[in-house]
Amino acid sequence: ETALHPEHYQTTYQYAVGLNASKPWGNETPQSTCCGGTGSENHVKYQEATYFVSDNTLWVALYMPTTLHWEEKNITLQQECLWPAKSSTIKVTAGEARFAMKLRVPYWATDGFDVKLNGISIATHYQPCSYAVIPTRQWKENDIVEITMPFTKHIDYGPDKLPAEIASKDGHQLETAWVGTLMHGPFAMTATDITNWTEATLNIDSRLASITVVEPNGPQTGTTGNLYTLMQGGRTFQPDYYRHDHTTHYFRI
């Protein structure tokens, strides 16, 4: 993961998934260094992977504020949304053209995902990890596509169990256990208060009913904009992209 330090001109490329892992930050020069990671350019390249086109099909792969000028079709579309995006709109702002549109259904969009064309849902069911299809039609100025994609809670499990000898390295005897990351939509959620493996345990049911979502109530933009939080008992979980200090995001389950 490439991230920027909130207070300094520093970047991080990757860091361990282990207990109480903290992001290692590179130097404070604008150039940074290759040994600190080669992904610093990622943030200005997302737009290159937002849309793809063939002769008569437009694929929408990412949901982010962008403007698409499709020269071959002489048409312009503008996408608007907040980030993180639980909804987005795509509007034809200039031109007319005939084509099909395919919109990505994220893997985590298992409940409540919907696509509306000019106010009417295009389907009653959407398959995660696929594309929702608006068949070939004549698009014109002011046509609007609305995408709704509520974040869902789920666990991203590791490929195998955490051995007891590893789990017990901090002096506590722990049994072999499955491990994984608590997810909210596309975001890995980190606990803000965990310092040893005995605390890094999630006691959950299959529906994650004990975990509640705290909707953002602060600013919608900026460093803390649109910040979603999860709670379990007295424990707080925040998105990993937001945390720059203690960032335990790997739990015994």
Where are these regions (language model features)?
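C-terminal beta-rich recognition modules with glycine/proline-rich loops and embedded aromatic residues
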Residues: E1-K91, Q127, T148-I253
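Extracellular and analogous surface-interaction loops
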Residues: I90-R98
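Surface-exposed beta-strand/loop patches in extracellular or lumenal glycoproteins
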Residues: A97-Y107
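Extended Gly/Ser/Thr-rich low-complexity repeat segments
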Residues: K102, E146-M149
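Solvent-exposed beta-strand/loop surfaces of large extracellular or lumenal domains
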Residues: T110-P135, I155-P163
